[in-house]
Amino acid sequence: MATLLQIGSGVIYSNALRKTLRRPQSSTCIIVTETTPCNKSPTVQRRSANYQPSRWDHHHLLSVENKFAKDKRVRERDLLKEKVRKMLNDEQKTYLDQLEFIDDLQKLGVSYHFEAEIDNILTSSYKKDRTNIQESDLHATALEFRLFRQHGFNVSEDVFDVFMENCGKFDRDDIYGLISLYEASYLSTKLDKNLQIFIRPFATQQLRDFVDTHSNEDFGSCDMVEIVVQALDMPYYWQMRRLSTRWYIDVYGKRQNYKNLVVVEFAKIDFNIVQAIHQEELKNVSSWWMETGLGKQLYFARDRIVENYFWTIGQIQEPQYGYVRQTMTKINALLTTIDDIYDIYGTLEELQLFTVAFENWDINRLDELPEYMRLCFLVIYNEVNSIACEILRTKNINVIPFLKKSWTDVSKAYLVEAKWYKSGHKPNLEEYMQNARISISSPTIFVHFYCVFSDQLSIQVLETLSQHQQNVVRCSSSVFRLANDLVTSPDELARGDVCKSIQCYMSETGASEDKARSHVRQMINDLWDEMNYEKMAHSSSILHHDFMETVINLARMSQCMYQYGDGHGSPEKAKIVDRVMSLLFNPIPLD
């Protein structure tokens, strides 16, 4: 393996870099003049997405410093952590107080410090008789239901039957109960009927009515309207965890009657400390990206190293996983680059050569590629082999066959879409989704993620991931694709691209665009039900529950990135720049 790594360095790398296309004066051109090994004609017409350059300056990134995360703050955080631990284990707390405390710790982003304690509390509670709480309090019942299901416990939706019997007599002023009921409904599985058909629509309508009634009122010191609007905008269970934490810290700090000053101070300091760690990681991957030369040389591709790092925070935010985040940022950036080669720039003949290169995985055949592809393939080759070398060294498993196959699979899926576009083929929705689950790139991401994240690698797991046999991966990939399609398909069709899920459904059924979009949104709901089912059945799965959670987190992250537009292609228009600033560059002020 060392030989493979050595081959992809030195002279070959330098020659590839020098031969790669130079940046033209404008990145919005449609006609590019060049001569390549596969095309002797001096003029090749190519598409352009007109992507804007990165708005993040590398040298500015290197200068970022978090003054709130000094050693003094780390010591202060650790002292507060022990105080919070004592509060969590306080036997004088009522059961509801304990559930609410756990919920606050999770929403404030500090529950990772107390995973063992929280798991013990919930496991013990799950085994006890809980009929008293079920009969008396909607908020308590719904909160318990959500926390149990979030942690993979199999709780029946029947706990809500006692409330449904008097559905018309619900206390509409019980806003806490309604919010808890609404949030609990998003933990439904494909086996549940009442949660989706009755409970969620009812709770949603009550919350909308509450907003309409109180939007111009001062509803107490803690702005309940803001909390309800946030929930309606995106249910907590679907939200990117780190972003939700940043919002909740501010909301929690507004409380007057029931906020815990120790907890909120602990959460603020911890947020800033973790942010400082993330900043250092971002500096490292930004430097790597500059060294590859890809952002400069492949002018037509999205230069999005900061956004690619942002994706990894959504998948796994805890400070101890810095190597995982940095490695996966590199994979994300390389996938973004080849996606744009297939979608925008390459001719069909060139793309076929590129796909063969991934199949062969042979650096000695580099010169068979068009000049602009050589550097890209070489960087991918080097990075993947480097990852495999580290895994062989630390975990004693050769993962090159699995990593290589994941790149071959995604390149073949990209090529299928290029052929569809070239031929004018319009797939039906099922045909489209079978390919799109792979072309969205998440199966490739998950194979690499599993290799660098898991302490103990299983060949059986690698084989099922490589063969696309894990249903939770299929569901997460589908949510990723559909969330992307809902906001990017108009721009992609305008520049010339294959039909997306919305257009496939319209063509297949004759539905209007509005109905097609509604159908896609329902597909996302159904996919979440399937993922929730897989999570509750994790005890019979060969996937470790921690890895399964990162798979689900990618679905959350995709809905964050595409909530208001194409957050990866046009981050400023989609509010992603503001979100990146809040998580990576703006520390929380401390009193």
From Swiss-Prot:
Residues noted as binding Mg(2+) 3 in the record, renumbered to the chain: 484, 488, 492
Residues the record lists as binding Mg(2+) 1: 339, 343
Entries under InterPro entries matching the protein: Isoprenoid_synthase_dom_sf (IPR008949), Terpene_cyclase-like_1_C (IPR034741), Terpene_cyclase_plant_C1 (IPR044814), Terpene_synth_N (IPR001906), Terpene_synth_N_sf (IPR036965), Terpene_synthase-like (IPR050148), Terpene_synthase_metal-bd (IPR005630), Terpenoid_cyclase/PrenylTrfase (IPR008930)
Subcellular location: Plastid, Chloroplast stroma
Gene Ontology CC: chloroplast stroma
Example GO molecular function: terpene synthase activity
Associated pathway: Secondary metabolite biosynthesis; terpenoid biosynthesis
Residues annotated for (2E)-geranyl diphosphate binding in this entry: 302, 339, 343, 481, 484
UniProt keyword terms in alphabetical order: Chloroplast, Lyase, Magnesium, Manganese, Metal-binding, Plastid, Transit peptide
GO biological process: diterpenoid biosynthetic process; monoterpenoid biosynthetic process; response to herbivore; response to jasmonic acid; response to wounding
Enzymatic reactions: (2E)-geranyl diphosphate = beta-myrcene + diphosphate; (2E)-geranyl diphosphate = tricyclene + diphosphate; (2E)-geranyl diphosphate = (E)-beta-ocimene + diphosphate
Annotated motif DDXXD motif, positions: 339-343
SUPFAM superfamilies listed in its UniProt record: Terpenoid cyclases/Protein prenyltransferases (SSF48239), Terpenoid synthases (SSF48576)
EC number: 4.2.3.105, 4.2.3.106, 4.2.3.15
Pfam family, one: Terpene_synth
Tissue: Predominantly expressed in flowers but also in leaves, siliques and in stems.
Function: Involved in monoterpene (C10) biosynthesis. The major product is beta-myrcene (56%) followed by (E)-beta-ocimene (20%) and minor amounts (less than 5%) of the cyclic monoterpene (-)-limonene, (+)-limonene, 2-carene and tricyclene.
Family from the record: Belongs to the terpene synthase family. Tpsb subfamily.
PANTHER family: OS04G0344100 PROTEIN-RELATED, TRICYCLENE SYNTHASE, CHLOROPLASTIC
UniProt name for this protein: Tricyclene synthase, chloroplastic
Lineage: Eukaryota, Viridiplantae, Streptophyta, Embryophyta, Tracheophyta
Gene: TPS10
